[in-house]
A protein has these predicted regions:
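Transmembrane alpha-helices and adjacent helix-loop boundaries
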Residues: 1-215
């Protein structure tokens, strides 16, 4: 056990050293790569909960990622919202859409669920591409304002790097707490056998919809 903890501490230390390299070198390339890694890790974290722990195959995960991103961009560009207000608002709207879409979709199983979520992703992509000036079409929305911390604008990769990695760490801790909660135990039971979980008085439909909504906040 002590050896296992020792290895974990060494890996954590190695990870911190690796994370410190981009801001210390201030290399634009490594900083931009680090930002993208953190952003995609956030998406993968949610997918891991849905696919890895709940056992639900979703091929439309990127659709909700896009809905959140476009939602906050539209609120700031077209309606001139403060970015710090637009981000949680877009997240809540995306979670609500995930709940509404998940209610009928997660009643499907296997290949049917995979095809339904794949179709959702294709539909959302078409809507964004054909949205004209509202979504910016294939070119995306220009003029998205920077996040501000007081008088400090998060306008470069270094500042964004220092923001996204602590946020990712917080999300990892929240995910661990979720897995240790009653909902997390329900998800693992559904992954092993949804029929057996249902026979043990677990509301499998509610648990699946809840995790789908939570991971898209």
């Amino acid at each position: 056990m002590k050896r296992f903890l020792h290895v974990n501490w060494l890996l954590a230390l190695l990870g911190l050293i690796v994370l410190a390299i981009p801001p210390l070198t201030r290399s634009p390339y490594y900083l931009s790569i680090g930002v993208f890694i953190a952003l995609h890790a956030m998406v993968a974290l949610g997918l891991g909960l849905l696919l890895g722990y709940a056992g639900q195959v979703s091929l439309g995960h990127a659709a909700f990622y896009g809905l959140g991103a476009y939602g906050s961009a539209i609120l700031t560009v077209h309606y001139h919202w403060n970015p710090w207000l637009a981000l949680p608002t877009a997240a809540l709207i995306t979670a609500a859409l995930a709940y509404i879409i998940g209610r009928p979709t997660l009643k499907l199983h296997g290949h049917y669920l995979a095809m339904a979520t794949l179709g959702l992703g294709i539909i959302v992509r078409i809507l964004f591409n054909e949205g004209g000036e509202f979504t910016g079409g294939p070119s995306g929305l220009p003029g998205i304002p920077y996040l501000q911390l007081g008088s400090l604008a998060i306008s470069d990769d270094l500042r964004m790097y220092l923001l996204v990695w602590p946020v990712l760490g917080l999300l990892v801790l929240l995910s661990r707490n979720l897995l240790n909660s009653r909902l997390g135990r329900c998800l693992r039971a559904i992954h092993d056998s949804e029929i057996a979980a249902g026979s043990c008085a677990i509301d499998t439909g509610r648990a699946k919809v809840m995790v789908l909504s939570l991971i898209h906040i």
